[in-house]
């Protein structure tokens, strides 16, 4: 059974030797990249390092969970990224694939499509009994390994501990020539912004949880369960899909800037990308590709006085989301056509880059941004 077939079939605890009521996501109160410390808080906390932490230097570019380090060998760089989070789906195998894809995504965002080594990080929840542990952990490891194999890399170590919560993650390392790494600060006025996966993952995961918990939310908002289930399967597919093809094409089509969209949401990562440009730029987001029906859920939540997971503000968390890329419009159209063919999934031009007269770069979503409803393709 391949990845998509498994997602479409759904996870049955009983056929995997577990009790009928086993739910992996009960082992944590947080979900996926939604566990991230808010971006503004994290930036403040990082000031503790001050002179120890080099940010936006010509030689050492450091992100929030990745780094590019010059080696003593001319032209070579050590590219390294780490990530870990809590489970957000109940199939341990698919969760393993999602975890691996998410760890690799920061390499791919820099155009580095070859990973030389991975480490796996795993905290086994103490609430798992021995039988559950001996079924769940191997399934997770197999999923992580299969995704690593698909990425053309190997897992050569890691750390496994016991913990009050189930934690999943890893480290990805690549030694790359400087020419293999996309410069993130080269966006120019006239560039367009590309997004390679739709947003709405947090809405899909949480609304699916409402079905399982039977907490009254489905009835309160008058939601359609089949539509939520369909969206959830689509999210599982895109979270477990590697951004590797997207990374390879960054070089072919001369990308000027790139990042991946994860826990800080589309706008949060667009702001990060705008902030590191050499010249003051404005990243203007004009379109929001949203997984089908997730906008309707957000609308109904907002109508009840909620925030709709801040989907329209662009800060709704994504897990193993797509790449956000700046490149010329001419190349963007070719990039999207080839990527869509390789991944059998759509991508979009969602905005533009303009010059800014003030000293600081910003990103913003237009108040009347067009919402694109993206149907499932699996």
Curated annotation (Swiss-Prot):
Classification via InterPro entries: PurM-like_C_dom, PurM-like_C_sf, PurM-like_N, PurM-like_N_sf, SPS/SelD
Residues that coordinate or bind Mg(2+): 65, 106, 260
A GO CC term assigned to this protein in UniProt: cytoplasm
Residues annotated as the enzyme's active site: 33
Cofactor(s) listed in the protein's UniProt record: Mg(2+)
Record-marked site positions (Important for catalytic activity): 36
EC number(s) given by UniProt: 2.7.9.3
NCBIfam families listed in its UniProt record: selD
Family: Belongs to the selenophosphate synthase 1 family. Class I subfamily.
Assembly: Homodimer.
UniProt name for this protein: Probable selenide, water dikinase
Classification lineage: Eukaryota, Metazoa, Ecdysozoa, Nematoda, Chromadorea
